[in-house]
């Protein structure tokens, strides 16, 4: 029997006041097979929410993409205010190896997600440091 390859994903969404928006984003993420949302931390002062979920690595990019797409639909950045600096409706979306997976696999998931977001949503994507391994 093969053990599941599990990664954690921690997208930060630029909405921390409207629970309905965050509930919609989380509902969209949960439509992907094997997703388990572990935590949703809304911050009104920063107007930012950190969602933490785990998922099998083969579904990770799709789950994150669905959340990012829903955030882009629902969050109006032209009206956004908050104490935390932000660049878009989704600021960061790191992947962390949890079990039977590696950082290199997480880097590859990040690259896959970046391509999806750039190509399907026409949203600029910036990839951070470990992306170069």
For the regions a language model picked out, list residue spans one by one.
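Short glycine-/aliphatic-rich beta-strand segments at the starts of folded cytosolic domains
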Residues: 4-16
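Short, conserved charged micro-motifs
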Residues: 17-21, 58-63, 101-106
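Short amphipathic alpha-helices in soluble, non-transmembrane regions
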Residues: 25, 64-70, 108-113
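Active-site cofactor/substrate anionic-group-binding motifs, chiefly glycine-
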Residues: 56-84
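Active-site histidine-anchored catalytic micro-motif
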Residues: 81-90, 120
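Conserved small/polar residues in nucleotide/adenosyl-binding loops
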Residues: 131-133
């Amino acid at each position: 029997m093969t053990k599941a390859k599990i990664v954690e994903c921690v997208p930060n969404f630029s909405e921390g006041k409207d629970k309905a928006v965050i509930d919609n984003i989380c509902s969209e993420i949960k439509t992907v097979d094997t997703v388990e949302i572990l935590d949703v931390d809304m911050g009104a002062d920063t107007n930012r929410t950190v969602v933490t979920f785990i998922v099998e690595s083969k579904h990770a990019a799709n789950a994150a993409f669905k959340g990012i797409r829903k955030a882009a639909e629902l969050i109006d950045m032209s009206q956004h205010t908050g104490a935390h600096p932000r660049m878009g409706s989704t600021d960061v979306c790191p992947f962390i190896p949890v079990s039977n997976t590696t950082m290199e696999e997480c880097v590859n998931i990040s690259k896959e997600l970046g391509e999806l977001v750039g190509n399907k949503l026409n949203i600029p994507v910036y990839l951070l440091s470990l992306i170069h391994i």
